[in-house]
UniProtKB/Swiss-Prot annotation:
Primary localization: membrane
Gene Ontology molecular function: any one: ATP binding
Name of the molecule in the record: Putative ABC transporter ATP-binding protein MG015
Superkingdom as given in the UniProt entry: Bacteria
Boundaries of every ABC transmembrane type-1 domain copy: 9-319
Disulfide bonds: none
Gene3D superfamilies: ABC transporter type 1, transmembrane domain (1.20.1560.10), P-loop containing nucleotide triphosphate hydrolases (3.40.50.300)
Binding site for ATP: G385, P386, T387, G388, A389, G390, K391, S392
This protein's GO CC annotations: plasma membrane
InterPro entries: AAA+_ATPase, ABC1_TM_dom, ABC1_TM_sf, ABC_transporter-like_ATP-bd, ABC_transporter-like_CS, P-loop_NTPase, Type_1_exporter
Membrane-spanning intervals of the chain: 9-29, 66-86, 161-181, 251-271, 280-300, 303-323
Keywords: ATP-binding, Cell membrane, Membrane, Nucleotide-binding, Transmembrane, Transmembrane helix, Transport
Amino acid sequence: MEGSWSYKLLYVFLCIVLGILYGIANPILLAQGLGFIFPITSSNGRAVDSIYSLIYPTNLNVFIRLTIVSVTVFVAYALIFVFNVAQNYVGIKLYQQTCATLRWKAYLKMQSMSTSFFDTQNNGDLMSRLTNDMYNIDNLFTQAGGQAIQSLFNILTTSVLIFLLSPVIALISLSILATLITFSFAFLKKSKTSYSQVQNNLGDMSGYIEEVLTNHKVVHVLKLQEIMIKDFDQYNKSMIKPTVRGNTYSIFLFSWFGFISNITYLVSISIATAFSVNSIPSFGISVINYSFMLSYIASLRQITLALDQIFTLWNLVQLGVVSAERVFKVLDLNVEKDTATIDKLPDIKGNIRFENVAFGYNKDKPTLTGINFSVKHGDVVAIVGPTGAGKSTIINLLMKFYKPFEGKIYMDNFEISDVTKKAWREKISIVLQDSFLFSGTIKENIRLGRQDATDDEIIAACKTANAHDFIMRLPKGYDTYISNKADYLSVGERQLLTIARAVIRNAPVLLLDEATSSVDVHSEKLIQESIGRLMKNKTSFIISHRLSIIRDATLIMVINDGKVLEMGNHDQLMKQNGFYARLKQSSVR
C-alpha cells in the first residue's frame, strides 16, 4: 500500500509541475505571439526576434500568423486542463485514502486505551475529533492541499521566470511582496489561536449535546428543558467570539493581499515605463516594449494569483492544521502496554481468589483495602453493601478494567497480571444493569457473544434466556433490525437479549451487576429464570438488591467502606445479627 501511495504522490507531483510549466509558458507564448503577429522594431529600426520567428518564416500573412499563435496557446491551455484534471483525480483518491487511514488509526488508538482513560475524557469531544476534526483535515487535503502545493511551486518557478525577464524589476517587485507579506504573519498566528479555540469549544459542545440526547428521558421527566437550553445557549455563544475573530483576521488578510497586489503592479509598471521612456537597459533585455510588459505583468499576475489562492484557502488551512493537532494528540496517546505473557488460557473451572487486594480510582483515596476471599467452581457469590461501598469495583477488577494497587487476583492458578486482557476476558461473561444493544439484527447482536456461533446455537441460547418467544413475535424474527434506541423493545426484553449473549459465550465465570433492576414483575420472573439456567456450572458473582436473588447465593460477601465485613450464606449472616442483618431489615422497612 505504501509503495502504491508513493507512486500516486509522484504522479500527482509530476502533473502539478507540468501543469504549472505550461501555465507559466502561456503568458510568454501569448506575448511573444503578439510580437510575431505585429513585428516590433527597436530604436535602430531592427526587428525584435520572437520565439515564433525562430520556427516559422516571418513573411507569412497576418491571418496565418494569428492562427499559429492561437493554436499554440490553445494547445497549452488544453494541456493545463488535462494535467489539472489528472492530478485532481488521483490526488483526491490519495487524500481520501490518507484521511481514512488517519481516522482508522485514531479510532484504533481510542479502542486500545484503558477504561481509566475514558473515565477522564469527554466522549463528545472524542467523537468530535473523529468526525468534525477529520472533516476539516479532509477539506485541508482535498480543497487546500493540492492547490497549496501547486500555488507554492507556481510562485517559485514564475519568480525565476521574471528574474530572467528583468532581474532589476523582478527584485523590486518581489521585495515589495515579501515585505508586505511578512507583516501578515502576526495575523496568521492570531487567527490560528482563534480557530484552535473554536475547535476546542466545538468539542465541549459536542460532549454536552451527546450527554443531553443520551439522557433525554431523564431531562423530560425532571423538566430540565429550560436549564438545558440555557446551558446549550452558553456553549453555542462560546463559538461566536473566536469564530468572528478568526474570520475577521482572514478577511483582513485577504483584503490586505489585494492591496499588496495592486501596489506591486503599480510600482512594477511605473519602473518598467521609466526604463522604457529613458531607454535604460534592464540587465536582461536591451529594450522594454509592450511585448515585454505583457509578459512581465502576466507572469507577475501568476505569482499574485497563486498567493491569492493561498490566502483564500487560509481558513481551510488554519482549521485543518488545528484539527490535525487535535487528532494527532489522540495518536500520540500512550497506550498502556499489556506485559502479560499468557495469551491463551486452557479450559479452566473458574475458581476465583483475591489476596489482600487494594485499589482506588484516586490513589489518595482507596476504594478497596485488604480484600481477601476465595470461591470455587459453581459457587454463587452475592456482593452486598450500601451505595459506594465498592461492590462494582470488585466486578471492574475481575474484568481487568483496572489494576489493583496491591495484592493478587487468581483464576484457578493463573494470576491476573500474567494473563493478557483478551485471554482473561474470554473466560468471563457479564450482564450489566444497562443492557446495551448494538445497531444490527437480533441475530448479529447475540453472535457478538461468540463470533462463530451458528444460527441453531443462537436460537438455543435465546430459548435458554427466555427471549425466543418475544423474538418470534417481532416482524422479522431474528432478522429484526434493532439498536440501542429500540424503544419498541421493553427494558426486560433488552435485558433478556444481553443474557442470551452471555449464554452463547458460555464462559466459566459470570458477572451480574444489577441485572434485574428497573424491570416489571413479569420480566423479572423471566430474567431470574434465565439467570438461573445461565449460572449452572459457572462461578457467578451477583450484585443485586433483590432479596430473592441474594438469599439463594452459596456465599454472601458484605462490603462497606471498601472492606469485607462479613461472609457466609443468608441464614448464617442473619444469625450473626450483624451488618448484613441490619441492612436487610432496613431494606424491608
